[in-house]
Amino acid sequence: MPIPGTPSRAELVDHLVKTRIAGDVATPRENNLSHYRKLANGERNWWLGLELGDRWADEQDVLAVMAERVGVNDDPEYRYGQDTIDPELTVDALDRLAGRLRKAAEDRQRVLFATGHPGGLLDVHRATAAALRAAGCEIVVIPDGLQTDEGYVMQFADVAVLEHGATLWHTHSGEPMRAILTALEREGRPLPDLVVADHGWAGYAGRHGVDSVGYADSNDPALFLAESEGTLQVVVPLDDHVLSPRHYDPMTAYLLSEAGLA
């Protein structure tokens, strides 16, 4: 559903709802609550590279943050059925993200891009990296030869990804980002001034003390908890894998325009 040029805020909100990037999203309520419960129970796979300790051991506290920052239904008795992402909250977060990208461009910062959802978000990150490079930023090149238990840490179109069996791999793990930052320090190279990512890539960078911003779905609460605690600077709520990656193009155009990078 292409939108010619850069959409207005109202046009973008409408587009997000029509494509189910926000609004009535594909992730059902029971899946959201299951993930909130697993995080609260200390299942580290759902911590997305972060260290949450026992601060979020109450599932209802997690739900409250997700209602505030994402727009899911705030009723703890609502257990099954349709859940939502508030498109106004999505655009609000895009505006905050645009402000951080604008600062990166003004200061000619070193920026690292990464994604654990290459099927949906790779081109969002690629386009943002290209715009920042054109504005004078250094896009961090990751060290060669990195791997985790899941696969090899590679870089395509300026975006770090996990490769497994000649396939770009979906991962929520923070280990690929750990591998990158550890290797940069080992080589005596400076860490990024900013990481733009999602899932565990964003989570681990924030945990490591690097300015980190990113994207997260309604069933991935850890990054929103980290944003509420100040560990991550901005997290944009959205469905991270809709029917076509082209559906994200108007969102990216809006983001880059608001950041002064279009």
Residue ranges and their predicted role:
Residues A98-R102, L121-G136:
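Histidine-anchored nucleotide/phosphate-binding helix
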Residues A114-H125, D198-G203, N219-P221:
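Gly/Ser/Thr-rich loops at beta-strand to alpha-helix junctions
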Residues P2-G116, P143-G145:
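Metallocofactor- and cofactor-centric catalytic cores in central/energy metabolism, strongly enriched
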Residues V213-A262:
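C-terminal functional extensions of proteins
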